[in-house]
C-alpha cells in the first residue's frame, strides 16, 4: 500500500510538469472570433438586386485605344457632342461679332472679364470700370412661358448683362479721386418709356488716394440710401456733365452683354477642348 501512495505524488508531479511544458494561450486570443473565408465575390458586394449596370462602375477606367494615354468615356463623347451643338447655337444668335463702340470718345481697355472706359474732359480723367462676371440677372419663375408654336430662338430669353460699375473722377495733379459706385436697379431695367427715370443709380460715394491700386476701408464712404435727395440729384448731374448718363448706361449694357456673350462662347470652346483633352 505504501509503494502505491508514493507513486501518487510522482504521477501528480509528472502531470503538472506536462501542464507547464505546454504554454497556455492568452485569454484575449481565445475571445477573438476565428477568421472565416468570404463566401461572396467582391464584385457582388456593391451590386444591388436587379442592377446590372453598377458592376461596371467597379471596373477601373480604361485609357483610350488610340494610344494617347488619356481617358475617353462615352459620357465624355456625349458631352463633346452637346458642347459642339451649343457653340453653334450661341454663335448663331450672337449679335456682335466684335465689341460695339461707345459714343463720347471713350477708350476701351479689356482684360479678360474686366473692362475699363477712359475719357479726359477739361483736365479731368474719368474712368469707368466694370466686370461681366455674375452680371446676368436671374430668371424668375413668374415669367410667361412660351407657347408651343414659338421657335426655339424665340423661346430662349435674351441674355442681358447689367454689371455694377465704378466711376472714378480725378482732377489734374489731384491727390484725391472721387469714386462713385453705381448699379442697375432690377426694377428699372427695361422701363424705357419713362423718360425722366434714371436707369442706373449711385450706391456709394467715397474719396480714395489717387494712384492707389487698392481702396482703403478706413476712408469715409457715403451710402446713398440715407442721403438727401437734393445732394443725390447733384451727384447724378455731376456724372451726366462728364458723360455718364442714361445714354451711356444703355450703351454700357450693350457693350457688357456683347462681352459677356463673347466670353461665354470662349468658355464653351475651352471646355470642349478640355473634355476632348486637346
UniProtKB/Swiss-Prot annotation:
UniProt-reported outcome of changing residue 92 to A: Impairs RNA binding and mitochondrial translation
Compartments where located: Mitochondrion matrix; Nucleus; Cell membrane; Secreted
Keywords for this protein: Acetylation, Adaptive immunity, Apoptosis, Cell membrane, Complement pathway, Cytoplasm, DNA damage, Immunity, Innate immunity, Membrane, Mitochondrion, mRNA processing, mRNA splicing, Nucleus, Phosphoprotein, Ribosome biogenesis, Secreted, Transcription, Transcription regulation, Transit peptide
Residues recorded with modification N6-acetyllysine: 88, 91
Expression across tissues: Ubiquitous.
Residues that bear Phosphotyrosine: 184
InterPro entries the UniProt entry points to: MAM33, MAM33_sf
Free-text disruption phenotype from the record: Embryonic lethal between 10.5 and 11.5 dpc. Severe dysfunction of the mitochondrial respiratory chain because of severely impaired mitochondrial protein synthesis.
Transit peptide extent on chain: 1-70
Topology in the lipid bilayer: Peripheral membrane protein
UniProt keyword annotation of Transport present: no
TM ranges: none
Any one GO molecular function term: mitochondrial ribosome binding
UniProt region (Disordered), positions on chain: 133-162
Phosphoserine, modified sites: 197, 201
Broad class of the protein's primary localization: mitochondrion
Stretch forming the signal peptide: none
Effect listed in the UniProt record for changing residue 243 to W: Partially able to rescue mitochondrial respiratory chain defects observed in knockout mice
Keyword field contains Metal-binding: no
Subunit field text: Homotrimer; three monomers form a donut-shaped structure with an unusually asymmetric charge distribution on the surface. Interacts with CDK13, HRK, VTN, NFYB, ADRA1B, FOXC1, DDX21, DDX50, NCL, SRSF1 and SRSF9. Interacts with CD93; the association may represent a cell surface C1q receptor. Interacts with KRT1; the association represents a cell surface kininogen receptor. Interacts with CD209; the interaction is indicative for a C1q:C1QBP:CD209 signaling complex. Interacts with FBL and RRP1; the respective interactions with C1QBP are competitive. Probably associates with the mitoribosome.
Family from the record: Belongs to the MAM33 family.
Name used for this protein in its record: Complement component 1 Q subcomponent-binding protein, mitochondrial
Source species: Mus musculus (Mouse)
Gene label: C1qbp
Amino acid at each position: 500500500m505504501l509503494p502505491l501512495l508514493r507513486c501518487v505524488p510522482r504521477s501528480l508531479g509528472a502531470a503538472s510538469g506536462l501542464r507547464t511544458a505546454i504554454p497556455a494561450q492568452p485569454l484575449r486570443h481565445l475571445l477573438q472570433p476565428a477568421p472565416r473565408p468570404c463566401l461572396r465575390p467582391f464584385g457582388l458586394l456593391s451590386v444591388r438586386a436587379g442592377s446590372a449596370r453598377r458592376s461596371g462602375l467597379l471596373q477601373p477606367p480604361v485609357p483610350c485605344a488610340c494610344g494617347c494615354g488619356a481617358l475617353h468615356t462615352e459620357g465624355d463623347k456625349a458631352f463633346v457632342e452637346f458642347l459642339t451643338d451649343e457653340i453653334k447655337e450661341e454663335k448663331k444668335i450672337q449679335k456682335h461679332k466684335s465689341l460695339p463702340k461707345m459714343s463720347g470718345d471713350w477708350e476701351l481697355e479689356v482684360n479678360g472679364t474686366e473692362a475699363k472706359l477712359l475719357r479726359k474732359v477739361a483736365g479731368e480723367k474719368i474712368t469707368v470700370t466694370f466686370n461681366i462676371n455674375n452680371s446676368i440677372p436671374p430668371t424668375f419663375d413668374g415669367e410667361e412661358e412660351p407657347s408651343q408654336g414659338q421657335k426655339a430662338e424665340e423661346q430662349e430669353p435674351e441674355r442681358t448683362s447689367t454689371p455694377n460699375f465704378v466711376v472714378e473722377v480725378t482732377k489734374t495733379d489731384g491727390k484725391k479721386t472721387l469714386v462713385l459706385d453705381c448699379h442697375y436697379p432690377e426694377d428699372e431695367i427695361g422701363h424705357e418709356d419713362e423718360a425722366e427715370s434714371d436707369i442706373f443709380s449711385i450706391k456709394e460715394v467715397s474719396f480714395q488716394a489717387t494712384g492707389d491700386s487698392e481702396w482703403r476701408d478706413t476712408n469715409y464712404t457715403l451710402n446713398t440710401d440715407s442721403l438727401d435727395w437734393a445732394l443725390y440729384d447733384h451727384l447724378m448731374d455731376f456724372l451726366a456733365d462728364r458723360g455718364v448718363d442714361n445714354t451711356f448706361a444703355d450703351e454700357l449694357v450693350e457693350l457688357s452683354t456683347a462681352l459677356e456673350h463673347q466670353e461665354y462662347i470662349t468658355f464653351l470652346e475651352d471646355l470642349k477642348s478640355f473634355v476632348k483633352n486637346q
